[in-house]
């Protein structure tokens, strides 16, 4: 389980109320924790470029349809709720995600 991996999260919490893919954004150095910080995906089409990062389905991501990362729904879930690895986000998409998170969280300045 590494930063940039896409897993299916079991149904838990307000934004993971149904099984859905999530992107692991937590640094790999914290792999001993019981929980992991993720950004959930949605297939709903919302025109909010700062809050939704559109990801095309590819064999590498394992996504079956165009999906968007919900930048405004960062959450922490138990590692045990991540059922299986779906794929991995491309480095270019990870950079886009990191930039959006910096802006959303107010870290970018």
From Swiss-Prot:
Enzyme class: hydrolase
Name of a matching Pfam family: PemK_toxin
Keyword Ubl conjugation listed: no
Any one GO biological process: mRNA catabolic process
Thylakoid recorded as keyword: no
Keywords: Endonuclease, Hydrolase, Nuclease, Repressor, Toxin-antitoxin system, Transcription, Transcription regulation
GO MF assignments: DNA binding; RNA endonuclease activity
Disruption phenotype: The mazE-mazF operon is not essential. A triple TA mutant (missing vapB-vapC, mazE-mazF and phd-doc TA systems) survives antibiotic challenge, suggesting the TA systems are not required to generate drug-resistant cells. However the mutant is more sensitive to oxidative and heat stress, and does not survive long term starvation during aerobic growth on complex medium. There is a difference in the level of branched-chain amino acids, which may play a role in monitoring the nutritional supply and physiological state of the cell.
InterPro entries: PemK-like, Plasmid_toxin/cell-grow_inhib
Gene3D superfamilies (UniProt xref): 2.30.30.110
EC number, as in UniProt: 3.1.-.-
Induction: Constitutively expressed during exponential growth and early stationary phase, it decreases in late stationary phase; part of the mazE-mazF operon. Negatively autoregulated by one or both of MazE-MazF.
Similarity field: Belongs to the PemK/MazF family.
Function of the molecule: Toxic component of a type II toxin-antitoxin (TA) system. Upon overexpression inhibits cell growth and colony formation. Its toxic effect is neutralized by coexpression with cognate antitoxin MazE. In M.smegmatis 3 TA systems (VapB-VapC, MazE-MazF and Phd-Doc) may be involved in monitoring the nutritional supply and physiological state of the cell, linking catabolic with anabolic reactions. Probably an endoribonuclease.
Entries under PANTHER family matching the protein: ENDORIBONUCLEASE MAZF, ENDORIBONUCLEASE MAZF-RELATED
Subunit structure: Forms a complex with cognate antitoxin MazE.
Name of the protein this chain belongs to: Probable endoribonuclease MazF
Higher taxonomy: Bacteria, Bacillati, Actinomycetota, Actinomycetes, Mycobacteriales
Gene that encodes it: mazF
